[in-house]
Amino acid sequence: MNKLMALLIFSFISMPSCATSPPANPAWINARIAQMQKEHPGNPPLSIWQYRYKGQTVYYFPPQCCDIPSTLLDANQNRVCSPDGGMAGDGDGKCSDFFKTRTEEKLIWRDSRSR
């Protein structure tokens, strides 16, 4: 009986979990985070956001200061557009619907260092 109980306990413990781990960031995102951590802290803090936009996963890098535009990249690190920022504050005009149509917002990383 003890052997049967031990076998059942071992079987239960060694069963694979049904929970799935979240998908890992692309390697280039991790490289960008490492690079951003080497820079001086931004004000506002540097951050990377993931969204779904026009049927694809995209990564949004908010503007940091003044007239610097934001950057929106696809999952292969190709530049999609600049949704905001720049001289007029409304980006390059190539994705003016981004803020209205984006979905599945996920914060990938935010710099926790203070300036």
Language-model-detected regions and their locations in the chain:
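N- and C-terminal low-complexity/disordered segments
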Residues: 2-4, 18-115
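Bacterial N-terminal signal peptides
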Residues: 7-15
